[in-house]
Amino acid sequence: MNLRMTLATAVRVLGQLRHDHRSVALILVVPALLLTAVYFLFENEALPPGFPRTFDRVGLMMLAIFPFVMMFLVTSITMLRERTSGTLERLLTTPIHKADLLFGYAVAFSIMAALQSLVATAVAYWIFGLDIKGSPGLVVLIAVINAVLGVALGLLCSAFARTEFQAVQFMPVVVVPQILLCGLFVARENMNDALNGISGVLPLTFSVEALKEIAGNTEATAAMWQDAAVMGGIVVGVLVLASLTLGRQTR
């Protein structure tokens, strides 16, 4: 890998995103707006004294889910534009290595993912008073890893789409099952054996489990670090798969 080439690619992609106001809004503003909607859904709930708010549980999980979904969408569509416009094919004819190109894209989108997670977490804590035992810094860490996972999956799936509509069609296959089975709606121990088994290998499940550990403990636990490490390993694995499809032409 050539660090200079990687950074040059990242700077180019960030420059393109800077002029794409809709994508910037989708990344930075929309998750905060959706989190606002979640907060007001539970604003008037009647709870016994000392009983935790539903928002403290659901809103925390949304800090993992929203960045994941948004970064998957933005990355897959942006990467598809690079392919269909011929930009990617032209770059691959230059001396730049595939790994430099791929990680350049990943670095650029990951920077946006980190900004997105910081904005959403700040809104949750300092506007809506998210109340959990763990540190906000750990929440941001898991949110960022999850957003980068969305980036990696977006890079991979973009290779198998010919239009932006087809890129969006990957959501019901890649994103929605993870949201349904991650333990947000039904505790994993209450699922049947088949669904519980599937849930156990889905990346989003590990992020939800990590956030549960943060919510219930004042200090980082071994289980939380283990879940974070698994997520990091999945991100690396998906990026390797994405690099194998980088030269695939979209016609």
Which functions belong to the PLM regions below?
Residues 90-98, 160:
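Short helix-to-coil transition segments within interhelical loops
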Residues 184-228:
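Terminal transmembrane helical anchor/hairpin motif
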Residues 39-40, 77, 121, 125, ...:
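Transmembrane alpha-helix boundary and packing residues in multipass membrane permease domains
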Residues 138-161, 179-182, 232-241:
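Hydrophobic alpha-helical transmembrane segments of polytopic membrane proteins
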Residues 62-69, 110, 144, 148, ...:
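Hydrophobic transmembrane alpha-helices
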Residues 2-88, 99-117, 126-139, 143, ...:
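Transmembrane helix-boundary elements of multi-pass transport/secretion proteins
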Residues 134, 150-151, 166-169, 182, ...:
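Extended hydrophobic-aromatic, low-complexity segments
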Residues 37-46, 161-201:
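Transmembrane helix segments
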